[in-house]
A protein has these predicted regions:
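Surface-exposed, charge/polar-rich loops and edge strands
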Residues: 1-392
């Protein structure tokens, strides 16, 4: 049973750190190596200095991360709310030429083993968990909220979100992708919000949209700390909870690039260019597309797959998994970059996928299945550093 609770979070003091957009960052696992220096330059208080570390040695970056976080707290760059709070959160953005918003709330969620109540849709790998566990030991803090969706709708959550929007947010910024992030601090002196939300979430399954490795890390850290010190704040983790029925968060596709010999014949109808490919991929009704390099020319194809959605599962089942001679398989979010990788000869073909639907993802996991690796990209993602949950 998912249990939720308010927590006394840490917030940047805007008077000390200045521009909050320059002090915050995307989640650690979407910051490319060549972009890290840009975030470091943006502000001496950029959260990436803690989230990814600045040391050179195998352990130095973790030690430095903990020291930097403690120094910022001592200096007053990060200040505590002073009492437990719920943190309503909103992201406004343009998607498919329309304005959208996704709302949720950041809370502490009690840790439970993976199962029917806390549901993964992708597998975790040992390396990232080991990295994040060493980082969590050093920092003793949840720096970014794990993103989870529930089937909803929740009247208690919607009522809370509607109410706080009547006042200015406590923190607000626009990030490098043009997404507007707004956060409120709701201390809920009477406890009624917490009680109503907790009662509703007792019967909900939380689908992890982003943060599988962070959740697995929190489970491992809890076992360590319980063995050493018993129950404590390590029994929970910070999450952004979004009602997918009301908010309909976009799930962007992650395209596949393939190095293969021989290059197979791909079924489909030929179209002119990438623009027509993207127009074809308007819905997740088993539509797919491909670009193949033949005799130095790019050939663009569109078609439909057989089977059950989501399309990414059908693509792997029908075309990718049985394909002989695959030397390399890559994952690319930008379709133009995937096309360029084929054009330059780095890969021989690319498969393009439509945006997924949350209900398709949920249907797979509710039947006990999991999606292929790198199947979904829930976007936008909550900003790291908007609120921090300390464990000490």
């Amino acid at each position: 049973v998912p249990t939720i609770a308010p927590f006394d979070g840490l917030l940047y003091d805007a008077a000390r750190v200045g521009d909050l957009a320059a002090a915050t960052a995307p989640p650690y696992d979407v910051i490319l190596p060549h972009d890290l220096a840009r975030f470091h330059r943006a502000s001496p208080h950029n959260i990436a200095r803690v989230d990814l570390g600045v040391g050179e040695g195998p352990h130095e970056k973790y030690t430095q991360a903990g020291e930097i976080l403690r120094r910022w707290r001592d200096e007053g760059a990060l200040v505590g709310v002073g009492k437990p709070a719920i943190y309503p959160y909103e992201m406004r953005f343009a998607y498919r030429a329309k304005e959208h918003r996704v709302r949720g709330m950041i809370v502490e969620v009690g840790l439970e083993p993976w199962g029917r109540q806390i549901v993964p849709h992708e597998r975790t790998m040992a390396g990232p968990v080991e990295d994040r566990l060493a980082h969590l030991r050093a920092t003793a803090a949840n720096l970014s909220a794990i993103y989870a969706v529930c089937a909803g709708p929740s009247e208690a959550q919607t009522s809370l979100l509607d109410r706080v929007e009547s006042r200015p947010p406590d923190r607000e910024l626009t990030d490098e992708e043009g997404v507007r992030h707004r956060l409120w601090v709701e201390t809920d002196a009477g406890g009624t919000d917490t009680e109503a939300l907790a009662a509703w979430y007792r019967d909900q399954a939380l689908l992890i949209a982003d943060g599988h490795h962070r959740y697995q890390t929190a489970l491992a850290h809890r076992e360590e700390m319980r063995s050493a010190r018993g129950p404590g704040p390590w029994d929970g983790v910070m999450m952004l909870l979004v009602d997918s029925a009301s908010e309909n968060p976009p799930v962007l596709p992650i395209h596949r690039v393939v190095a293969v010999d021989p290059v197979p014949e791909i079924p489909g109808d030929r179209v002119r260019d990438l623009g027509e490919v993207l127009a074809w991929l308007a819905d997740d009704d088993l539509r797919f597309a491909a670009v193949v390099r033949r005799n130095g020319e790019l050939v663009h194809l569109v078609g439909r797959l057989e089977g059950e959605p989501p399309t990414v599962s059908a693509l792997h089942r029908n075309l990718l998994d049985p394909m002989p001679g695959v030397r390399d398989l890559g994952f690319v979010q930008d379709p133009a970059l995937a096309e360029e990788m084929v054009h330059t000869g780095r890969f021989d073909l690319a498969f393009f996928l439509p945006p997924a639907r949350v209900e398709y993802v949920r249907a797979v996991v509710e039947q006990g299945g999991q999606l292929p690796q790198k199947s979904t990209y829930f976007w936008p993602k909550p900003r790291t550093g908007m609120v921090i949950r300390p464990l000490s």
